[in-house]
């Protein structure tokens, strides 16, 4: 619901909290700060709970150069590692096209990575880049999910061209998805075709993992 969504604030933008936990002001590059700040209380304090699902917005860190270390990055990486180590939770992480939050120390706790692609060569090219980055840190359990698939030709294209990563399902293009967004209601509840397709992906994923 929109009222719950408005309660969320990205952790990466909580300057006072980051300074309190790391000992340095956000935006600081270099200098001294804590690389493993306390984060155990953050999931419950700064998330919202709806229908048994807890949502936490981590945010992103704008860095001037690759390999740059800053308090915000240390905070997010420590928080992500903490979430992976929680034994009683199922963690779903919606990430940008990359594996920047993952590392060799945490990869064993990742059951699978789903790479969502559209039926275009550019999208599949991005998927191959993600696969290489994931393999570089030891993550081998990658699977493709086709998104916004409009017809059999697009489904066939993905089946033929997705040779490097197993394809485990498709999410159909359905105008009711946009309708659900306009109405402010969950796609899962409003769009039966997407719900059925999602159940199929989950079933296949459970069989593979």
Task: Show the residue positions of the predicted features.
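N-terminal phosphate/diphosphate-binding loop that engages ATP/GTP or pyrophosphate donors
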Residues: 1-51
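Cytosolic-facing regulatory segments adjacent to core modules
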Residues: 30-46, 54-93
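Generic structural signal for well-ordered, non-membrane alpha-helical segments
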Residues: 39, 69, 191-198
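A short acidic, helix-capping loop that chelates divalent metal ions and anchors anionic groups
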Residues: 64, 178-181
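Conserved catalytic-core segment of NTP-binding enzymes
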Residues: 71-170, 178-179
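C-terminal boundary of histidine-terminating zinc-finger modules
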Residues: 181-194
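C-terminal alpha-helix
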Residues: 197-208
């Amino acid at each position: 619901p929109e009222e719950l969504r408005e309660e969320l604030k990205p952790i990466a933008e909580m300057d006072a909290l980051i300074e309190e936990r790391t000992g340095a002001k956000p935006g600081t590059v270099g200098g001294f700060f804590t690389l493993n700040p306390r984060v155990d209380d953050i999931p419950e304090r700064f998330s919202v709970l709806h229908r048994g699902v807890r949502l936490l917005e981590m945010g992103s860190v704008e860095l001037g150069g690759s390999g740059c270390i800053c308090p915000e990055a240390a905070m997010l990486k420590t928080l992500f590692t903490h979430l992976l180590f929680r034994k009683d939770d199922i963690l779903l992480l919606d990430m940008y096209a990359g594996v920047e939050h993952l590392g060799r120390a945490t990869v064993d706790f990742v059951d699978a990575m789903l790479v969502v692609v559209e039926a275009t060569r550019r999208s599949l090219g991005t998927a191959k880049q993600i696969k290489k980055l994931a393999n570089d840190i030891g993550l081998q359990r990658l699977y493709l999910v086709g998104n916004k698939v409009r017809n059999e030709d697009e489904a066939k294209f993905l089946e033929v061209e997705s040779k490097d990563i197993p394809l485990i399902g498709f999410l159909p293009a359905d105008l009711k998805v946009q309708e659900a967004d306009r109405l402010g209601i969950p796609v899962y509840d409003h769009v039966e075709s997407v719900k059925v397709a999602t159940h199929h992906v989950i079933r296949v994923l459970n069989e593979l993992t």
